[in-house]
Swiss-Prot record:
Known role: Catalyzes the conversion of uracil and 5-phospho-alpha-D-ribose 1-diphosphate (PRPP) to UMP and diphosphate.
Keyword line: Allosteric enzyme, Glycosyltransferase, GTP-binding, Magnesium, Nucleotide-binding, Transferase
Family: Belongs to the UPRTase family.
InterPro entries named among the record's database cross-references: PRibTrfase_dom, PRTase-like, Upp_A, Ura_phspho_trans
Gene that encodes the chain: upp
UniProt protein name: Uracil phosphoribosyltransferase
Residues noted as binding 5-phospho-alpha-D-ribose 1-diphosphate in the record, renumbered to the chain: 86, 111, 145-153, 217
Keyword GTP-binding: yes
Superkingdom per UniProt: Archaea
Amino acid sequence: MPIEDRDNAYLITHALAKDTLSQLRDIETEQVAFRKGLVKLGRICGYEIIDGAMETEYAHVQTPLTETTGEQVSGLDNIVIVNVLRAATPFVEGLLKAFPRAKQGVISAGRDEAAGMNQDGMFPITIDYVKLPEITANDTVVVADPMLATGSTMCAVLDHVNDAAKSKPKNLFVLSAVSAPEGLLHVGSEFSSADLLTVAIDDYLDDEGYIVPGLGDAGDRAFRTV
């Protein structure tokens, strides 16, 4: 569903996606359930991308009884999923259930928390590791990070994705579970060719750049580092 006043941002409104997100938000959801919830949410979001953005074609099928005509999704061999470490790892695990033949890229990126936000509400970002497959004009690229807060990390990641692309991909999706209005604005304005997909738009960012109400630190909760 398009988001008002944002030409390239869309809400994923599937009932199971919203139900799963509610469980992820709950402070009582422990590590294993949280991680499994991110996997489940990634899978649902993958199916929503297939349903909303990918084409189908007719195919001849031989059943045990006769020959018939069915439909198949085209382009499933031209999917590139970019995992923004580390919080996106279980999220991407779910996406791979929807896109089992996807090529995968990995970018390790993190905020410089000590430096704090600048006057534009952005953090300096440290990129520690980049490994991306070849990206071509036939590819649908999904850059996954459960939390889109200030947009600082995602903007840095997308710079690397664009640098790696031999040509503009067929589709470029930024996928998150929860987004802040500020992050959608920053990323959407700087990368107008990307479609931003999110299950929820939360209220605001606090003074430290965390999404409120949010779901806490997705990486810490998934990997039990708190």
